[in-house]
C-alpha cells in the first residue's frame, strides 16, 4: 500500500494549486450600494368644496343661453361652464350642451380641467360597427341610424291603404324583382295597380308644389311616441308630402311631463289619476342653450296610480322660434298637448322596434 501514498499526495497538491489559481484569477466581488431615491413631494389637490355651504343670498344672473345649475358640491346655484372654460369639482360644465370636464391636461393632480364636447358612442349590428350619427341600410326595406349606441330603423316600404273604389279584392303581394310589396287587384292580376294618387294640382295652385309629379302616393305615418317619459324628447314620422314626393323623416320636440315636478300631490282625493297638468306661470322653452322668443304655458300629461299610462289623446304640432346667444336663431316643431288619458296599453318609449312587431317580416331587419 506504500505505492498509493505518493499518488495521494500528488492529487492533494494538484487540488490545492487549482484552488489558489481560481481565487487569484476570479474578479473581486463588488459590494452593491443602494442609495434610496429622493421621495417626490406629496401631491396635494386643492379643495373646491367647503362645508357647510356658503352661498350668496341671490343666485347669479347667467348670460342668455347659459344654464343656471347646482354646483358640483351640491350647494349653490352657479352659471354652468361653457366649451373651453376651466372646470373643477365645483364649477361643472353645462350638461344641457353635452359638455364634460376633461382632466387629462392636469396630470397627476386631475383637479382643474377644460370643458369639452361629449362624443357619442357607436353601434354594433350583426357584427358591423357604425359610428355615431351614421345612417345605413341593412337591407332594401329599412333605413337605420346609429344614435349614441342605439340603432333606430324606419321602414322604406310605405304601405298606404288599399284602394276602395275601383279594386274589388285588393291583395298585398310581393312582386318579383322589387323589394317592396304592392297592391294587386284580382280583376287584373297580370300587373300591379297603384292606389289612389295624390292630386298635386291642388298643391300646385297653392304654391306648395312647383312641378307636378305623376303617380305620387301621399303617405304620412303617425308620430312615434316621445323618446322620454319625462323631460325633453323627440318623436319622428315619415312623410312624402313634398315637392319631390320623396319619403323624408320629420321630427318634433316633445315633453310629456316635467321630470322635476311631482305631479302626484295634485291628484284630488278619491281619484286615481290626473290626466292633464298645467303650470301656473308661463315659461320659455330652452334647447341647447337657446331660448324661445316667447313664453308658453303648455299642458302636460299627468300620472295614473293604477298601473295605467297617461299619454296624449289630443295634440297638435306648433312651430317655436329659438334665439341663441351666439349665432342666428332657428325654429323647431314642438308637440302641443291638448288632452291626455290613462291607457292600459303601456310600452317603453325607448323600444325603437315596438312599432315593427306587427310587421310579418320583422325578423328581416337583422338579416
UniProtKB/Swiss-Prot annotation:
Keyword presence, Glycoprotein: yes
Family matches, as InterPro entries: CCN, Cys_knot_C, Glyco_hormone_CN, Growth_fac_rcpt_cys_sf, IGFBP-like, IGFBP_CNN, Insulin_GF-bd_Cys-rich_CS, TSP1_CCN
Keyword Glycoprotein: yes
Protein location: Secreted
Keywords for this protein: Cell adhesion, Disulfide bond, Glycoprotein, Proto-oncogene, Secreted, Signal, Wnt signaling pathway
GO BP of this protein: bone development; cell adhesion; glucose homeostasis; negative regulation of chondrocyte differentiation; negative regulation of fat cell differentiation; osteoblast differentiation; osteoclast differentiation; positive regulation of cell differentiation
A GO MF label: heparin binding
S-S bonds: 49-73, 53-75, 55-76, 62-79, 87-101, 93-115, 273-310, 290-324, 301-340, 304-342, 309-346
Residue ranges of domain IGFBP N-terminal in the record: 45-118
Residue ranges of domain TSP type-1 in the record: 215-260
GO CC terms of this entry: cytoplasm; extracellular matrix; extracellular space
Signal peptide feature range: 1-22
One Pfam entry name: VWC
Residues covered by the CTCK domain: 273-347
Domain of life assignment: Eukaryota
Annotated glycan sites: 86, 143, 284, 343
Alphabetical list of Gene3D superfamilies matching this protein: Complement Module, domain 1, Thrombospondin type-1 (TSP1) repeat
Main location: secreted
Domain VWFC: 121-186
Purpose of the protein: Downstream regulator in the Wnt/Frizzled-signaling pathway. Associated with cell survival. Adheres to skin and melanoma fibroblasts. In vitro binding to skin fibroblasts occurs through the proteoglycans, decorin and biglycan.
Xref: PANTHER family: CCN FAMILY MEMBER 4, CONNECTIVE TISSUE GROWTH FACTOR-RELATED
UniProt record similarity statement: Belongs to the CCN family.
Name of the molecule in the record: CCN family member 4
Organism: Rattus norvegicus
Upper taxonomic lineage: Eukaryota, Metazoa, Chordata, Craniata, Vertebrata
Gene name of the encoded protein: Ccn4
Amino acid at each position: 500500500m506504500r505505492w498509493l501514498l505518493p499518488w495521494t499526495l500528488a492529487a492533494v497538491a494538484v487540488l490545492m494549486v487549482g484552488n489558489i489559481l481560481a481565487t487569484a484569477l476570479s474578479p473581486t466581488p463588488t459590494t452593491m450600494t443602494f442609495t434610496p431615491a429622493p421621495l417626490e413631494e406629496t401631491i396635494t389637490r386643492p379643495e373646491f368644496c367647503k362645508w357647510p355651504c356658503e352661498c350668496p343670498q341671490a343666485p347669479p344672473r347667467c348670460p342668455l343661453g347659459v344654464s343656471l345649475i347646482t354646483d358640483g358640491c351640491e350647494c349653490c346655484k352657479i352659471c354652468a361652464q361653457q366649451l373651453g372654460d376651466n372646470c373643477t369639482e365645483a364649477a361643472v360644465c353645462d350638461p344641457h350642451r353635452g359638455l364634460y370636464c376633461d382632466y387629462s391636461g392636469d396630470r397627476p393632480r386631475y383637479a382643474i380641467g377644460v370643458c369639452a364636447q361629449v362624443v357619442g358612442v357607436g353601434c354594433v349590428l350583426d357584427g358591423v360597427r357604425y359610428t355615431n350619427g351614421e345612417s345605413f341600410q341593412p337591407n332594401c326595406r329599412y333605413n337605420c341610424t346609429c344614435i349614441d349606441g342605439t340603432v333606430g330603423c324606419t321602414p322604406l316600404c310605405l304601405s298606404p291603404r288599399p284602394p276602395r273604389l275601383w279594386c274589388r279584392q285588393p291583395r298585398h303581394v310581393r312582386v318579383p324583382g322589387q323589394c317592396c310589396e304592392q297592391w294587386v287587384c284580382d280583376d287584373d292580376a297580370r300587373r300591379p295597380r297603384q292606389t289612389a294618387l295624390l292630386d298635386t294640382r291642388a298643391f300646385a295652385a297653392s304654391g306648395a308644389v312647383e312641378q307636378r309629379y305623376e303617380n305620387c302616393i301621399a303617405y304620412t305615418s303617425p308620430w312615434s311616441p316621445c323618446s322620454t317619459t319625462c323631460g325633453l324628447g323627440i318623436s319622428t314620422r315619415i312623410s312624402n308630402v313634398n315637392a319631390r314626393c320623396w319619403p323624408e323623416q320629420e321630427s318634433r320636440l316633445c315633453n310629456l311631463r316635467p321630470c322635476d315636478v311631482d305631479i302626484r300631490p295634485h291628484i284630488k282625493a278619491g281619484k286615481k289619476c290626473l290626466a292633464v297638468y298645467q303650470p301656473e306661470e308661463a315659461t320659455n322653452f330652452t334647447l341647447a342653450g337657446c331660448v324661445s322668443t316667447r313664453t308658453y304655458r303648455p299642458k302636460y300629461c299627468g300620472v295614473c296610480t293604477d298601473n295605467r299610462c297617461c299619454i296624449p289623446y289630443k295634440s297638435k304640432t306648433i312651430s317655436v322660434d329659438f334665439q341663441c346667444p351666439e349665432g342666428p336663431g332657428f325654429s323647431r316643431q314642438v308637440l302641443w298637448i291638448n288632452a291626455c288619458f290613462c291607457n292600459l296599453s303601456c310600452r317603453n318609449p325607448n323600444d325603437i322596434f315596438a312599432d315593427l312587431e306587427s310587421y310579418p317580416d320583422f325578423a328581416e331587419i337583422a338579416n
